[in-house]
């Protein structure tokens, strides 16, 4: 974090602006909106600022900047056309430990101005830390289009009702759930349609009913996808933003975790084939206990919870204890990682089916049907199989799969560190030996297309259209690699 985001209350506070031209006028306009007492140090003012001075909306000092000007002000903005003067202002302000901004000179600023979406009292600031102002402006434009003009009205009405809600609903959790329901329900729709009187009646009715409603806990099983935060579903994002507590495993990426509601408790219940693990029974018991405490629990799992994620086992436990639950599917690793590696799971010329199998089974599980897995013209994807790659290759060859069958090991799928090692079934063990976990094994003729179709990360064979990726990032407002590249 290059800059700490903070909103300052400038109402009635003295702010010094050095300069009397168009640049200074733009900053002064914003300061006046915030209620600041603006003082302008300049020998001459342009027409716009002269009019403001004549109306006593700003205090014109009518002289060049002097060091004494900064002593009694809250913050300083240097916006003159004289670069040397601006930098002098900066150094003097720094010596007095006063916040100072030199317009268009990031190296001489103790604070910077973000792009702002104003839905007063709702304000959203967007900043690139001064690195890419145009990108920040484009993001602001996208957000402006997404956010309804009625957002400010919604905030104002909510502010008027805040004390009443606090008096009726005693716990923080109850109040948070109440407001989440209103902002996603009929109240919000009425405000959007400018029916504010009806909206307040709706709010009153909902508040009256709120204490009668069952506020018991629940569990939502959410698939986090293969890693890239941009692949998290909208429903999944909503769930982790509304959770009281999130139980997550080792396959959930940092990018996904950064989207979890900040006040939510996070509990790691991870497991990996090579390392320690949280017993599944302990995780099941924890979900039940937290839900019975009345908390909204999200069980966040890498990939899809019903594809080798033990999601079914966890839901059986919840059903047995009569805990309300829901499921949000996610993009499973076999789909996400192969797509990012440029390996289509099916192809009319090479594979008419795709089979997913796990290399990590229960001790008493029946043996795998190797004859079925060794069939040609199908794509075989093996989860958690890196430790058993030699055995897998041996058994498939014993049951008729050619040692020349293309094979790949994809590590850190869909993440910036993704690596795709390709070879054949004959050297699969060597490919897997050096692959960092989590790794996915892909076997089949479609792997041969990787060389031609790879588009992401270090294995990409050709340049993508940067403009397309930038547009996709801004259009989706995602947090995946496309946005990082932009």
UniProtKB/Swiss-Prot annotation:
EC number(s) stated in the UniProt entry for this protein: 2.1.1.107, 1.3.1.76, 4.99.1.4
GO molecular function: NAD binding; precorrin-2 dehydrogenase activity; sirohydrochlorin ferrochelatase activity; uroporphyrin-III C-methyltransferase activity
Residue numbers of Phosphoserine PTMs: 128
GO process terms (BP): cobalamin biosynthetic process; methylation; siroheme biosynthetic process
Catalytic reaction annotation: uroporphyrinogen III + 2 S-adenosyl-L-methionine = precorrin-2 + 2 S-adenosyl-L-homocysteine + H(+); precorrin-2 + NAD(+) = sirohydrochlorin + NADH + 2 H(+); siroheme + 2 H(+) = sirohydrochlorin + Fe(2+)
Record-listed NAD(+) binding positions: 22-23, 43-44
Residues binding S-adenosyl-L-methionine, per UniProt: 226, 302-304, 307, 332-333, 384, 413
Top-level taxon of the source organism: Bacteria
NCBIfam families: cobA_cysG_Cterm, cysG_Nterm, PRK06136.1, PRK10637.1
Alphabetized HAMAP family for the sequence: Siroheme_synth
Family statement drawn from the similarity comment of this UniProt entry: In the N-terminal section; belongs to the precorrin-2 dehydrogenase / sirohydrochlorin ferrochelatase family.
Name used for this protein in its record: Siroheme synthase
Source organism phylogeny: Bacteria, Pseudomonadati, Pseudomonadota, Betaproteobacteria, Neisseriales
């Amino acid at each position: 974090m290059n800059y700490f985001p903070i909103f300052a209350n400038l109402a009635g506070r003295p702010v010094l602006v050095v300069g009397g031209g168009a640049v200074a006028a733009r900053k002064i306009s914003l300061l006046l909106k915030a209620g600041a007492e603006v003082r302008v140090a300049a020998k001459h003012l342009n027409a716009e600022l002269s009019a403001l001075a004549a109306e006593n909306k700003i205090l014109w000092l009518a002289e060049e900047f002097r060091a004494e000007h900064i002593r009694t002000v809250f913050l300083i903005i240097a916006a003159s056309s004289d670069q040397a003067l601006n930098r002098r202002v900066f150094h003097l302000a720094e010596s007095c430990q006063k916040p100072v901004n030199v317009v268009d000179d990031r190296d001489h600023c103790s604070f910077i101005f973000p792009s702002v979406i104003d839905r007063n009292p709702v304000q959203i600031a967007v900043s690139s830390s001064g690195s890419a102002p145009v990108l920040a402006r484009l993001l602001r434009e996208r957000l402006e289009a997404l956010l309804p003009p009625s957002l400010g009205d919604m905030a104002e009405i909510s502010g008027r009702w805040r004390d009443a809600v606090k008096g009726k609903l005693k716990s923080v959790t109850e109040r948070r759930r109440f407001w989440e329901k209103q902002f996603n329900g009929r109240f919000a729709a009425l405000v959007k349609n400018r029916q504010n009187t009806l909206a307040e009646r709706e709010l009153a009715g909902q508040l009256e009913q709120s204490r009668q409603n069952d506020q018991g806990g629940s569990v939502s099983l959410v698939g986090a996808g293969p890693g890239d935060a941009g692949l998290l579903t909208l429903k999944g994002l909503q769930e982790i933003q509304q959770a009281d507590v999130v139980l997550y495993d080792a396959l959930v990426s940092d990018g996904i975790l950064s989207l979890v509601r900040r006040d939510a408790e996070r509990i790691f219940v991870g497991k990996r084939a090579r390392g320690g693990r949280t017993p599944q029974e302990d995780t099941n018991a924890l979900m039940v206990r937290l839900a019975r405490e009345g908390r909204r629990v999200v069980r966040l799992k890498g990939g899809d919870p019903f594809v080798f994620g033990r999601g079914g086992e966890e839901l059986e436990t919840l059903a047995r204890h009569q805990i309300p639950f829901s499921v949000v599917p996610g993009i499973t690793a076999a789909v996400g990682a192969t797509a990012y590696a440029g390996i289509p799971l099916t192809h009319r010329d090479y594979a008419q089916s795709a089979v997913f199998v796990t290399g990590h089974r229960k001790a008493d599980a029946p043996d795998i049907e190797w004859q079925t897995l060794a069939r040609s013209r199908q794509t075989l994807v093996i989860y958690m199989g890196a430790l058993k790659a030699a055995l897998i290759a041996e058994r498939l060859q014993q049951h008729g799969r050619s040692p020349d069958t293309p094979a790949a090991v994809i590590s850190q799928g869909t993440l910036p560190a993704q690596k795709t090692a390709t070879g054949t079934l004959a050297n699969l063990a060597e490919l897997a030996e050096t692959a960092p976990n989590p790794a996915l094994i892909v076997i089949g003729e479609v792997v041969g297309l990787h060389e031609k179709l790879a588009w992401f990360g270090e294995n990409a064979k050709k340049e993508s259209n940067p403009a397309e990726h930038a547009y996709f990032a801004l259009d989706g407002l995602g947090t995946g690699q496309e946005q990082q590249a932009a």
